[in-house]
Design a protein with these regions (language model features):
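Hydrophobic alpha-helical transmembrane segments and their immediately adjacent juxtamembrane loops
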Residues: 138-176
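Peripheral, non-transmembrane regulatory/ligand-interaction domains of membrane transport proteins
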Residues: 1-120, 124-125, 135-146, 175
Length: 176
């Protein structure tokens, strides 16, 4: 998933590849006017405020993804300690997902920090969006922290799975 943004004083253009359902949902609310209050909140202010709202909804979506990862970690823990099942495949898939998301989130943090420095160019003079973007950075930091912890946990599960598999193989070889 990739999102490109172009903005000026009175406009914001987004182009995205892949499935960015939260962004599509936000656009549909504005286009179809299904929630007039939300539409006014999104469209009635500056381009910088709209950019904040877009980034915020995407970061919130990442928080949902992180919660799913934590649930998958719990499932993998059960599999690692189950003698009848192998966890190698699930560990590999989840490690890849965590690594990919970490790369995305670290890039997003740099972009949000840089954007926060240049906000006033695209805001109305009475608008101070610093607190809004600081709040987004706090959420991004929470995602990063959780992903870092998840990565460490995955490494522990990987090592444990390897040790238990090796021990099981050694027992089988000892019997033979």
């Amino acid at each position: 998933r990739q999102l490109s943004v172009f903005m000026g004083n009175d406009y914001l253009v987004t182009i995205h590849q892949g499935d960015l359902k939260p962004l599509v949902d936000m656009i549909n609310v504005c286009r179809e006017n299904t929630d007039p209050q939300r539409r006014q909140r999104l469209m009635g202010r500056s381009a910088s405020f709209l950019l904040h709202e877009i980034i915020d909804v995407l970061v919130d979506d990442m928080l949902h993804t992180v919660r799913k990862i934590l649930g998958n970690l719990d499932d993998i823990e059960d599999i690692v300690f189950d003698d009848t099942r192998s966890a190698a495949r699930q560990i590999s898939f989840l490690r890849r997902e965590i690594t990919t998301l970490r790369r995305i989130v670290h890039s997003l943090k740099r972009i949000v920090l840089e954007t926060g420095k240049n906000l006033q160019r695209f805001s109305r003079t009475e608008e101070d969006l610093t607190l809004y973007f600081d709040d987004v950075i706090d959420h991004v930091d929470k995602v990063i922290e959780t992903l870092d912890e998840s990565k460490e946990t995955m490494e522990i599960y990987k090592d444990t799975d390897f040790m238990l598999s090796t021990e099981k193989a050694n027992k089988i070889l000892a019997v033979l």
